[in-house]
């Protein structure tokens, strides 16, 4: 296994992270440690973790707002810098995602994965969610007050909660297994597509 040596530079301080014990004195070194641990985890399944680590390091060191980790065959969510508000994870092999620590995200593309479980931050800044072509049976978007656009077609959705997404304008739920859909609070809705369901 190739050891990924992660160097993160933040606030004029440099942290060289290998397999040493995490430095808990600063958020910066803790992030670098978690990134190194994630990058060094070998699953022998064709994942391009080294490429992902390089892109994450660049986003972290340059305080970038956008991060593209698409088409890397990733099976686990890596640590995401807090400056990132637009995240592209399209076309990977992700199954279970937890974004509760990523409250700064506003735009997220998770299309064409294998996601069956996902958790979003409570009252996040999410405006655009692309989660089409996955394996979701339920989707809970409670407290997602900022959501404007949701693309969730081609899943196995039987249940969806968008009751708090009153700013929602665009909703695509085609090719799911929904038997009912409550849109009573979606007064801003401009475009709805929900064909090939059980409604």
Language model: regions and residue ranges:
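Conserved hydrophobic beta-strand positions in leucine-rich repeat
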Residues: 65-69, 87-89, 106-110, 127-131, ...
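Leucine-rich repeat
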Residues: 80-84, 102-105, 121-126, 142-147, ...
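LRR N-terminal entry segment and analogous cap-like coil->beta motifs
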Residues: 40-97
